[in-house]
Amino acid sequence: MAESKIYMDLHNYTKKYNIIYADPPWSFKTYSDKGKGRSADNHYPVMNIEDIKNLPIQHIVGDDCVLFIWVTFPLLKEGIEVLESWGFTYKTIGFNWVKRNKISDSWFWGLGYWTRSNSEICLLGTKGNPKRISAGVHQIVDDRIMKHSKKPDTVRQRIVELCGDLPRIELFAREKPDGWDVWGNEV
């Protein structure tokens, strides 16, 4: 994917952020016709790993910054590579979203590569020496699935509780939540 205007405009940002929350539009291989209808590229434009790695994130990263980046388990290795290419050190899984169906309280089961998948993880990486404000933030997020790839709103609240009311931006955002700057082609 060539750098479109939306991605190049990160070069023009002058504000530095202490919290970056990202849900990249990962491209990944489907192995069956059944999986193709549910893949991300049927719902929005996706990016390959190299293009995600090469985003000019360094223009917006503060000296002491925490990155939260969503990744699926099949792309865990690539997710850590992206985190590191953006200048962060992997620390832990910040959040593990255990998914329930839209209507019932039963578990949601994706197709998966080997086993039927359910949860999605949000990696946590740091740059500099950011501080944890609260020790009471839990990793497990038990919430319903919504429209394709939309993450639970509670995660943003937990991030602020964990890190404090610091300058923050959501990358690849689909909406503009209060208190957050946003960037992406769906806002």
Q: What are these model-predicted stretches?
A:
Residues 1-187:
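Class I S-adenosyl-L-methionine-dependent methyltransferase catalytic core
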